[in-house]
Swiss-Prot record:
Record organism: Mus musculus (Mouse)
Domain of life: Eukaryota
GO cellular component: mitochondrial matrix; mitochondrion
CDD domains on file: TBRG4-like_N (cd23739)
Job of this protein: Plays a role in processing of mitochondrial RNA precursors and in stabilization of a subset of mature mitochondrial RNA species, such as MT-CO1, MT-CO2, MT-CYB, MT-CO3, MT-ND3, MT-ND5 and MT-ATP8/6. May play a role in cell cycle progression.
Primary localization: mitochondrion
Record protein name field: FAST kinase domain-containing protein 4
GO BP of this protein: mitochondrial mRNA processing; mRNA metabolic process; regulation of mitochondrial mRNA stability
UniProt keyword terms in alphabetical order: Mitochondrion, Transit peptide
Pfam families in UniProt: FAST_1, FAST_2, RAP
Length: 630
């Protein structure tokens, strides 16, 4: 560092020495006049003005010369050999030429790793690198940042003296570089800095980018910064999001796409920014390609940001593109809409027909993605349902046992939701060799997979009487008590309070009933044929892992299960339950219960305790009446 400082001082003093003989006499003449006016005029004279400019502004870099013949030769070179020959020619190289030759070399060899290795051993290349190192303080800013990128792409070793010299020079100049040069470094060099452990340079670069973020005044620079450097600094990304809100009106469709994909990749659910982008997507009739639409659907799905008008537009705009989609794009799109919980029937019917028309191109991974998406949304094709599931079984059954265990469970669970599971598939996942690993694991992911296994076991018990086993062991399906500190939702709390007031005596009903079927009932009551409450504890309860009573149910008596349905349990902007909750309701019915549904949108209309109590009584009467009508 001291050597560099001396070089700069020497350059400054050399220029000052050249100007002093001319300036000094003038200065003496002006001072001899002892006139303030004369002294002022001396400052405006040409010679003293040069000195004032020299002292006021550090002249470190050599002025860039006019475009020379050598510049054209460097630009037009198509082979590394042509560039290396310029070193031994009669051309005079100014301070930038050696760096420009290196930059052009890296461009020509960008996709030729073997030639890069040979070049590193060439004596002319080594001489070129040393020449650049000796002239580094005189290289212009724009050339310097490109030079650093070129040295990274030429894969110089991190211990290389020349590479370290260029990195150090960049660090010296960071404060004086234009913001566009900082952005170029972030765009082209940040990943290399991170990989090659140039952490100090990267940290300083990010610091300057963050300090000067207000200098961003165009959408391209902003989007580039978000995609290339935003993930490296949390505080920088926060500033960039603020800048996005300021410039979002200038964004075109591709820039909006890049911002959304960047947010999705970093799992940054910035609600104000997502709302602003959604507004412009809805209000402006941007022409969007298939790729843009797929990326937008992916980003909104990944961030779970539900915006009705955007979802409607994406579905409507994607529909004409379906004939040109590959099976992979169909699977990706279906998965995105499943995350959004947005079921557009024409779109999903088109997915089904398109996959059936290209069966030979549909791979197992495509089938898995589409099947899981259909199960999440509880989508049953109205046309060609049998053909679709025949294709699914044809692709899935031969390889099901060889798949990753968690994926096996997910796929069979999806088939259970859609009511198209086969006995062989039940046998595959209920085999003791598979469920043992999930039963013993304490990780949340494995526990979730085991819960799906319990649902599959329930499907086999209640909906497939011809299935003879194997089943999960009784000890495995015993319900796990929910934690006492689990926060209750407002609907859950109000429902329990109303039921307690309605039942009065705890013997007449139970709250939060954990069944051996993998589902928890919000409440359970037992009514006789006349609609009067019966004490639950006196009668057998096969749905419990540990029954408490021993008396059979009286003739005409019915068990009633209360199931509340919260807002997240439904498809977006719909009163249709998601597949998981349709399966739960189906299992409870198959277990012999009458179901009283308590959806959030009905409960919100009830204001007084009397209305809530009357609502539940009316629901129970209707359930009993429907059962008698059957």
């Amino acid at each position: 560092m001291a050597v560099r400082l001396m070089k700069r001082c020497t350059c400054l003093l050399r220029e000052a020495t050249r100007l002093v003989p001319t300036v000094a006499p003038v200065g003496r003449l002006r001072l001899a006049g002892v006139s303030c006016k004369t002294l002022t005029s001396s400052v405006s004279s040409p010679s003293s003005g040069s000195l004032a400019e020299l002292l006021g502004k550090e002249q470190v870099f050599t002025p860039y010369p006019e475009h020379q013949e050598l510049d054209f030769l460097i630009e037009k070179a198509s082979r590394p050999e042509q560039l290396l020959e310029l070193l031994g020619s009669d051309h005079s190289l100014h301070h930038n030429h050696a760096a420009l030759i290196l930059i052009r070399l890296s461009y020509l060899l960008s996709e030729k790793p073997k030639e890069k290795a040979l070049l590193a051993e060439d004596a002319r290349f080594q001489r070129l690198v040393k020449l650049v190192d000796s002239q580094i303080t005189c290289v212009w800013h724009g050339t310097l940042v490109k030079l650093l990128r070129s040295l990274y792409t030429l894969v110089l070793p991190q211990i290389s003296k020349e590479l370290q010299s260029v990195e150090q020079e960049v660090r010296w100049r960071l404060r004086r570089l234009k913001y566009k040069h900082l952005v170029f470094l972030a765009e082209s060099c940040a990943s290399f800095m991170k990989e090659q452990h140039s952490q100090e340079l990267l940290a300083e670069l990010l610091m300057h980018l963050e300090r000067r973020w207000t200098e961003i005044n165009d959408s391209r620079t902003l989007v580039t910064m978000m995609t290339m450097a935003g993930h490296l600094s949390e505080s920088l990304m926060n500033h960039l999001e603020d800048k996005c809100l300021e410039l979002v009106e200038q964004f075109g469709p591709d820039e909006l796409r890049k911002v959304l994909v960047t947010l999705a990749a970093q799992s940054r659910r910035s609600v104000p920014l997502l709302r602003a982008i959604s507004y412009h997507l809805v209000q402006k009739p941007f022409p969007m390609t298939k790729g843009m639409l797929l990326d937008l659907a992916y980003a909104y799905g990944k961030l779970s940001f539900h915006q009705t008008q955007v979802s409607q537009r994406l579905a409507a705009d994607l529909l004409p593109f379906i004939p040109s989609m590959t099976p992979g794009e169909v699977a990706r799109c279906a998965k995105s809409f499943a995350f959004l919980k947005w079921l557009n029937l024409p779109l999903f019917e088109a997915f089904t027909q398109h996959l059936l028309s290209r069966v030979q191109d549909v791979s197992l991974s495509h089938v898995c993605s589409v099947l899981l998406a259909f199960a999440r949304l509880n989508f049953h094709p109205e046309q060609e349902e049998d053909q679709f599931f025949s294709m699914v079984h044809e692709k899935l059954d031969p390889v099901l046992g060889s798949l990753e265990p968690a994926l096996q469970v997910d796929l069979v669970w999806a088939l259970c939701v859609l009511q198209h599971v086969h006995e062989t598939e039940l046998h595959t996942v209920l085999h003791p060799g598979l469920h043992a690993r999930f039963l013993e694991s304490k990780s949340p992911k494995d526990q979730s997979t085991f819960q799906k296994l319990v649902h599959i076991n329930t499907t086999a018990l209640l909906e497939h009487p011809e299935y003879k086993g194997p089943f999960l062991p009784a000890s495995a399906v015993a319900p796990i008590p929910s934690p006492s500190n689990k926060k209750m939702t407002p609907l859950q709390k109000e429902l329990q309070e109303t039921l307690k007031a309605l039942l009065g005596n705890t013997d007449k009903g139970s709250l939060e009933v954990a069944t051996q079927y993998g589902w928890v009932l919000d409440a359970e009551v037992l009514l006789d044929a006349d609609g009067h409450f019966l004490p639950l504890r006196n009668f057998v309860a096969p749905h419990l892992a540990q029954p408490v009573g021993n008396q059979p149910l009286p003739p005409g008596a019915k068990r009633i299960a209360f199931l509340r349905w919260e807002f997240p349990n439904f498809n977006s902007r719909s009163k249709d339950l998601l597949g998981r909750f349709v399966l739960a309701r189906r299992h409870v019915l198959a277990a012999g219960f009458l179901v009283v549904d308590v959806p959030y949108y009905e409960w919100l209309d009830l204001k007084s305790e009397w209305q809530k109590s009357a609502y539940l009584k009316d629901k129970m009467r209707k359930a009993m009446a429907e059962e008698l009508a059957k």
